[in-house]
Amino acid sequence: MHASLKISSQQRLLVIKHGALGDIVQGFGAFASLRHGHPTAHISLLTTPAFAELAGMMPWFDQVLVDRRAPVINIAESLSIRRLLRQPWDIIIDLQCSRRTARYFQFFARPNARWVGTVRGCSDPCPDFTGVNNYQRMMVAAGLADGVLDADVDMRWLLQAAQPAEAQQLPTPYSVLVPGCSLAKPQKRWPAEKFAALATRLQAQNLAVILVGTAADRAVVDLVQSQAPASINLCGKTSIAELARLMVAADSVVGNDTGPVFLAAATGAPTIMLMGPDTDPAMSAPTGARCDWIKGTPITKLAVDDVLDRLRGLTRNVT
């Protein structure tokens, strides 16, 4: 490992972070750390098309580059990535640490490239991350590149990109429920009927309930609303910025292990993540000023009362 990675104001950094949304949000701390450590450096982010627009709004990067993560047999895309990685970067910080980015180091990077990551043979290897939260993993990597570890993660860049909840004429106070998550892992979903029961209990305490999700979550969100018809259904109707603005003003947010819940925690909203056996809280618990998690094996074992008990520790409006 290099004794020091002090980078001059004229040097160039490349940060690799592909996604998904939760992974991007957990990287905010590392992004801020690198920018605070190198306030005048040129810092580029390599990410996927899905997050290029969001990354372009971030205050930490001078340039956003797109990686389509094409198969290796796509010669044109592979050569494009090779040309990119062969540019005179002073340091490449791999925050994805995937098999794909390991191949990037092994086959595409310059032989003498300074590379922070977990791939064998890189110049600045991260320590063993077994049992370490994903947020902290990226903070450690940023620290190896002389990031400022106590840098403030200012979310105004995202929150100011959307109208406040009052401008949307939403009732207050309100709770946000996130009933969806990856369709590939239904075992990570708390049952829709339990979300509906939670919504009804919250409404009985004079809290409005707002349901959110992507278009892919529409079926489960609609099912929740059918059983808790007083809920407001905003599924598929919010941008990431609008979702963040909705979350930050919420009395509480409850949802599965999915990107919007990490976003809620990052805004400082009182947040509860519901976990099943596929989620290891040591590695994947959300980070934020007021967040918690509760796990069931299977997730269907989690009771509505269990969730309400956790909420009572985060907000005064749930009794």
Question: In which residue ranges do the predicted regions lie?
Answer:
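Catalytic machinery of carbohydrate-active enzymes
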Residues: M1-T319
